């Protein structure tokens, strides 16, 4: 059974932006329902909710040619639309709500080049409850970095999504459980009841 120290736990809802949700989660209603329920339970239990989103300045100066993943964004107006305007905002079903923190990143991991670690240290956070889109992107990258920084990670498997279902399942089944507690949304809600 999952046990969380409420004073030292934060939940990271990662890359759950309107444009990304529309591309990666079909249909999105069940995913958004589970994620919204988790965030509601976390807020009610006074856990810190942190939304991590991908975003860039006009002209995309954060993206260099050597970054294979994001170089495609720089050359494609279609990809840029995923991060621009309302499509780049946190999905309205999830927040942000008063008290939530929004961290903008320019790479895959929630930690790379952001002030996330400073926020976590300032709040004496030791446990990170992670979910988001994509399992093989931000979730994997943030999990590995969190482990290396000695956080105690929890992955909400049914609040993660990936375009590649086989890769998603392999990560959840074969890798994540070696580095984190892997639970479902109902487990987090029950732990906070």
Where are these regions (language model features)?
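Short, flexible, mixed-charge acidic loops at enzyme active sites
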Residues: 62-70
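Active-site loop/turn elements of alpha/beta-hydrolase fold enzymes
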Residues: 16, 54, 158
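Short acidic, Gly/Ser-rich segments with clustered Asp/Glu that frequently serve as metal-coordination loops
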Residues: 17-23
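A short alpha/beta connector and helix-capping loop motif
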Residues: 7-9, 25-42, 46-55
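Acidic-leg catalytic submotif of subtilisin-like serine proteases
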Residues: 10-16
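Active-site-adjacent betaalpha module
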Residues: 1-10, 37-45, 70-193
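Short, solvent-exposed beta-strand-terminating loops
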Residues: 55-61
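Active-site loop signature of alpha/beta-hydrolase-fold enzymes
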Residues: 19, 57, 162
